[in-house]
Design a protein with these regions (language model features):
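Hydrophobic alpha-helical transmembrane segments of membrane proteins
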Residues: 1-85, 95-277
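Short helix-to-coil transition segments within interhelical loops
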Residues: 90-94
Length: 277
């Protein structure tokens, strides 16, 4: 039954996200193309057009973030706590399956939004460099890439990969926290939306406070990240690979534990405190 729920969820949201991604890629092509011709054009009107396209591209990027977050909230609240909830909760499925389907689909679409944004940046970069002779620049670019790879030891790549895992788990945990906040806000008859928003920020504050209490939030962990980004060869001197991986693993554990807690809280409230009246 979970498979059917996921199929329904992806069908219900595909048009929204698909249109948004097409708009994002179209904006990147238009903006990048305008920058490509800008160097050979001395028209004030064309410069104004480039400025407007830059604003459009920025607005679409911001809109992608906003729409992704709002869709996560709306699909959960309207589908499970609103009028559609009367139908959804009569299906032969458990509350765990309902929340799981929402969490999986939201996670997939969030990853797709990140990939779409990265692709738009790539398209923009290629179009901005289109006036260069890329074939002549390729050997130099390849040499630079090989040199950068040669400077990075195995500890760097392990740390980089683990950072990606930590970021992914934190994202899933944040989505689960959004669902838990929606359920908490649902308990308030007056101003449930405001209560849900306040609940989310309180929950995130508590999670961040506990991370800082264990000295793995904005302290050791971010120091290690900045050290890697600043100089990939200095990770051994700035912070040992073992120490970095240890702090990252604790960070991962905290994020995973909170994610499980938010998920469990959501399911429990939906099972015992749901009121669709």
């Amino acid at each position: 039954m979970l498979k059917k729920l996921l199929k329904y969820e992806f069908r219900a949201t595909a048009r929204t996200y698909g249109g948004m991604y097409l708009a994002l890629l179209a904006a990147s092509v238009l903006f990048g193309g305008s920058l490509w011709r800008w160097n050979s054009t001395n028209s004030d009107a064309y410069s104004t057009l480039v400025g407007l396209l830059s604003l459009v591209y920025t607005a679409v990027i911001i809109g992608t973030v906003v729409v992704t977050i709002m869709t996560i909230v709306q699909r959960f609240y309207r589908n499970l706590l609103g009028r559609e909830g009367y139908l959804m909760h009569t299906l032969p499925v458990t509350e765990t399956q309902l929340v799981t389907s929402k969490l999986i689909s939201s996670t997939v679409w969030s990853l797709c939004s990140i990939l779409a944004a990265c692709l738009s940046f790539g398209i923009l970069a290629v179009l901005m460099m289109a006036d260069m002779d890329l074939l002549e620049q390729l050997p130099l670019m390849w040499s630079g890439i090989r040199e950068a790879f040669a400077r990075c030891n195995m500890e760097f790549w392990e740390a980089l990969a683990f950072s990606g895992v930590v970021s992914f788990v934190r994202m899933v945990s944040a989505i689960a926290c959004i669902y838990a906040a929606c359920m908490v806000g649902h308990q308030f008859k007056n101003h449930p939306a405001l209560a849900g928003i306040l609940s989310f920020f309180v929950m995130q504050y508590v999670q961040g406070w506990l991370e800082k209490l264990l000295q793995i939030g904005t302290g050791v962990y971010e120091t290690a990240i900045y050290s890697i980004v600043g100089d990939v060869g200095s990770i051994g001197t700035a912070v040992s690979a073992l120490g970095y991986m240890g702090s990252a693993m604790v960070t991962l554990g905290i994020a995973a534990a909170f994610g499980v807690f938010w998920f469990g809280l959501t399911v429990w409230l939906m099972r015992n405190k749901l009121n669709l009246k």
